[in-house]
């Protein structure tokens, strides 16, 4: 059972939703005049494709397969100088980065070398069009991979940008089972150097299994010991900081991912502005900011120009304290940018002013480069989030959606049960069954129940990009009074449900399967 994880699926017991519509086939690829070759100064082009290509319908057929072999292992590590039990992918935290080009086939062989636990690997934000069985959510699309067993994932890189993969087995990911994904493609802003994935994590000196057992009875999130940038940081006198070097005049692309368990971050690099050019897997019209709010599971592509006086500068990830667990290292989650690679001195730069709220980046800033409008829905689902403290005789405190908490049946995945008996979906609570092909559906997700604490939730949908139609904290949704943004609203797969407020999302039922919709706080 997964606490603090609100799962609406596209089909399983307890707070899920189901898309059982027919697929929308990729349109036949049209031959066109070749776009100028992709380069740092002309990143909008990608062979015969470009940023103007509708990537929901058209995908390059590269004929290339990128193959990876992952083994999960039990070990100990001191990523911040404090040794603890961890779980790793191929012996590292984060695990190896999956790298592919837009249109490639990706094959990942996962071997469970853990001593006592099952596992499954989910490829966060990857659309998995017509490959629902490869999504990697155990108890929904597959059984857990047993110790000593293997499972092979095979899917097409239908999007481009970056994301992360992580275990979807209980709270295993936050013991170290995660890594980056990079899918090369066009970009909406020029850059000179691709710095790859930059992960932002909170870090505990106890295992997440121990923390879960404690939190489930107390109802209070555990205190955080530290935070990591790309899997490393200092703590007291141990550990080391993440660091990299800038060359004056160059533009550097960072692919940010918030891989935290219970922390939204405010990210910045002292004295440097950021050009934000993608949110999740969606290229956007570039905008500038000096502080970036990034919720759990979200990704942003940013470009930093090395245009400051050559020196050393702090890279910082501050916890957004309005929704994040208290962190004893809140002001010390830092990396170092050096203009002189031989320098060993700590920076003396100062942080930008930032707010402690847990809001998303403004809707007005997240303008998709490829413009698409939302349409009138065939149906609207209401989803309420509540915190109930009297569920079981054991005293466990659980989060619920529409009164249901998530139940994991590892030996009876929802997808399998639905194929065996189609009436299963009608008899099981927590499922929204969406049966109309290629139709719009809206979800109104509210966070103002009588027992709901006033904190935000990062809401993640598998198998789809959704349209963010409305998002407001401290307010109640009204079908007549709430204004929806239907003209080119933000599209993404993870968005913040504001504290004591609501989030309205819309999407098209064009990807049949069993897909979870859940809060990404662990």
Q: How does the language model describe each region?
A:
Residues 1-28:
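Fungal secretory targeting signals
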Residues 115-116, 128, 139-193, 292-344, ...:
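Extracellular/periplasmic metallocenter environments
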Residues 110-115, 256-260, 445-449:
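Asparagine-centered strand-capping/turn motif at beta-strand->loop junctions
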Residues 130-142, 277-290, 331-334, 377-522:
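Active-site pocket scaffolds in enzymes
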Residues 81-83, 117-124, 255, 263-270, ...:
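Short, hydrophobic/aromatic beta-strand segments
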Residues 70, 108, 121, 167, ...:
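Divalent metal-coordination and catalytic microenvironments
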Residues 132-139, 143-146, 199, 204, ...:
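Histidine- and aromatic-rich segments of cupredoxin/plastocyanin-like copper-binding domains
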């Amino acid at each position: 059972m997964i606490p603090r994880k609100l799962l609406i699926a596209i089909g399983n017991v307890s707070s899920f939703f189901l898309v059982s519509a027919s697929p929308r086939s990729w349109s036949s690829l049209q031959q066109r005049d070749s776009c100028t070759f992709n380069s740092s100064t002309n990143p909008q082009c990608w062979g015969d494709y470009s940023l103007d290509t509708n990537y929901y319908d058209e995908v390059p057929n590269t004929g290339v397969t990128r193959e990876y072999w992952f083994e999960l292992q039990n070990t100990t590590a001191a990523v911040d100088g404090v040794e603890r039990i961890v779980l790793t992918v191929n012996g590292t935290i984060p695990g190896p980065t999956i790298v592919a080009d837009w249109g490639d086939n990706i094959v990942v062989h996962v071997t469970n070398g853990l001593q006592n636990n099952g596992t499954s690997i989910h490829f966060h934000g990857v659309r998995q069009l017509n490959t629902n069985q490869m999504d990697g959510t155990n108890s929904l699309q597959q059984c857990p991979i047993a110790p000593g067993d293997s499972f092979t994932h095979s899917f097409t890189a239908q999007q481009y940008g970056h994301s992360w993969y992580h275990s979807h087995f209980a709270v295993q990911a936050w013991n170290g089972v995660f890594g980056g994904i990079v899918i090369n493609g066009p970009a909406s802003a020029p850059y000179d150097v691709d710095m790859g994935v930059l992960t932002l994590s909170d870090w505990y000196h106890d295992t997440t299994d121990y923390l879960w057992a404690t939190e489930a009875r107390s109802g209070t999130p555990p205190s955080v010991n530290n935070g990591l940038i790309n899997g490393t940081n200092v703590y007291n006198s141990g550990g080391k900081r993440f660091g990299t070097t800038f060359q004056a005049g160059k533009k550097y692309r960072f692919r940010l991912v918030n891989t935290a368990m219970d922390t939204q971050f405010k990210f910045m690099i002292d004295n440097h502005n950021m050009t934000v050019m993608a949110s999740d897997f969606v290229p956007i019209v570039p905008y500038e900011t000096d502080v970036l709010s990034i919720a759990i599971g979200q990704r942003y592509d940013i470009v930093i120009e090395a245009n400051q006086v050559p020196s050393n500068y702090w890279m910082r990830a501050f916890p957004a304290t309005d929704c994040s667990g208290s962190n004893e290292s809140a002001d010390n989650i830092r990396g170092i940018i050096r203009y002189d690679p031989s320098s060993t001195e700590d920076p003396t730069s100062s942080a930008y002013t930032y707010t402690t709220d847990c809001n998303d980046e403004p809707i007005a800033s997240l303008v998709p480069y490829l413009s698409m409008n939302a349409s009138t829905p065939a149906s609207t689902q209401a989803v309420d989030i509540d915190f109930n403290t009297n569920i079981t005789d054991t005293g466990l405190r659980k989060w619920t959606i529409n009164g249901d908490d998530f139940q994991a049946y590892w030996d009876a995945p929802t997808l399998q049960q639905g194929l065996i008996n189609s009436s299963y979906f009608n008899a099981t609570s927590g499922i929204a069954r969406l049966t109309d092909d290629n139709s719009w559906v809206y979800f109104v997700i509210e966070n103002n129940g009588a027992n709901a604490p006033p904190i935000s939730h990062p809401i993640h949908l598998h198998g789809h990009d959704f349209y963010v139609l409305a998002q407001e904290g401290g307010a109640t949704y009204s079908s007549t009074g709430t204004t929806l943004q239907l003209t080119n609203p933000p599209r993404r797969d993870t968005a913040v449900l504001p504290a004591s407020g609501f989030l309205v999302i819309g999407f098209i039922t064009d990807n049949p399967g069993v897909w979870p919709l859940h809060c990404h706080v662990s």
